[in-house]
Amino acid sequence: MTTGNRDMKNPYYRALYPLYNPAAEKHWIAVAGLKKGSKAGSYELIKNFNEAGQGKWWTVAAPGNGIYSSTTDDHGNPGYASWGGTSMAAPHVAGAMGVLMSRYDQMNALQVRDVMFTTANHKNADGTNMEGWTDVDGTVRKDGEVSDRMGWGVPDLDKGMYGPGQFLGKFEYNMAKAGSLDVWSNDISNVALDQRKAEDDAWMKA
């Protein structure tokens, strides 16, 4: 589900659906759009697209500018053209999920989604934060936390090959069914759970 292209601090209502029906959250992925930055190897959130906002816990970001894709013209004739929008970003995330589901064929979709979320990246090639990672209020989220503009960050298939980065709930994985040794070398933290609890507690007190 895409966040939308309306320059808003929150996603379009369809991407924000789990806010109103929390049971849907585990089945949801929202996608925001990125573009290349002015420096080589840098990326930034596209400012006239909707941000993660209140949907940040199920949002990731992906390239959504200058994407060469199949299209149709006003008469329905097929062709190819360069397009921009969160609809161009979403297929990147669907592809990332497909790769990770192939890698972890004994996991269910929720577990694979959690791997994608908790191994997402928000760094440029030089190690600096992508523009748009900093929260609206100026808070710079640390590694493993979730931004109210970019969500979890950008799916990182390299890191995603080595297991989850955090456990967001009960997580069972049957190694015997996997059929062979499976090495998970990512450090496991709980910083996102701590962040969410702190934010939920603050909201309840407000």
Model-based region annotation:
Residues 9-23, 40-48, 71-78, 123-147, ...:
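Surface-exposed intrinsically disordered loops and tails
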Residues 6-8, 36-37:
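Conserved nucleotide-binding/hydrolysis micro-motifs of P-loop NTPases
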Residues 18-98, 102, 106:
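Extracellular S/T/G-rich loop segment that most often corresponds to the catalytic His/Ser-adjacent loop
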Residues 1-4, 31:
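Active-site neighborhood of phospho(di)ester-bond hydrolases with catalytic His/Asp-centered motifs
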Residues 9, 90, 100, 156-158:
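Basic, gly/Ser/Thr/Pro-rich low-complexity segments located predominantly at protein N termini
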Residues 28-30, 102-205:
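C-terminal subdomain of the subtilisin-like protease fold in secreted/lumenal serine endopeptidases
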Residues 4, 85-87, 151, 156:
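Residue-level detector of functionally special positions within alpha-helical transmembrane segments
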